[in-house]
């Protein structure tokens, strides 16, 4: 199984059962999340989390404000079509502050933490912030686009 996995689900009642399933499939570390109607960690309200670590599932509620990230109204993080979403992503990776950056930091930070590159979610968020602010995240996207034949 995978060493680590961050999985968003559409229903908060699925976070614990799916974390257990991931453990049964051999995943060692995982976070299954549902954030205020979204299948990701959110800034619009609280996020329900089931974290799998060393065979044990612990569930808790995550609030972005505990990490210094302000709450946002749902309209502030709403995406659009593919071109609009690409524009938003590029602006975040170029260092633009705002609700889109905030939600990217939370979710990237969780992935970094679950991937074992940070000791906790706060450390993962700091790592994500450093990657964006240094330009490394945008550079990685451009490199991925080149090798895949895309045009980011």
Question: Where are the model-predicted features located?
Answer:
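Glycine-rich anion-binding loops and their surrounding alpha/beta cores
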Residues: 1-152
């Amino acid at each position: 199984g995978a060493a680590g996995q961050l999985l968003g689900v559409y229903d908060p009642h699925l976070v614990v059962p799916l974390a257990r399933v991931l453990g049964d499939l051999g995943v060692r570390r995982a976070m299954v999340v549902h954030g205020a109607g979204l299948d990701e960690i959110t800034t619009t309200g609280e996020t329900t989390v089931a974290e799998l670590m060393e065979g044990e599932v612990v569930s808790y509620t995550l609030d972005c404000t505990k990490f210094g990230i302000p709450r946002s109204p749902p309209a502030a993080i709403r995406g659009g079509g593919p071109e609009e979403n690409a524009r938003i992503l590029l602006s975040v990776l170029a260092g633009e502050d705002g609700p889109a950056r905030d939600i990217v930091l939370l979710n990237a930070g969780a992935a970094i933490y679950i991937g074992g590159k940070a000791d906790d979610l706060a450390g993962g968020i700091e790592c994500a912030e450093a990657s964006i602010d240094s330009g490394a995240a945008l550079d990685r996207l451009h490199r991925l686009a080149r090798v895949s034949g895309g045009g980011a």
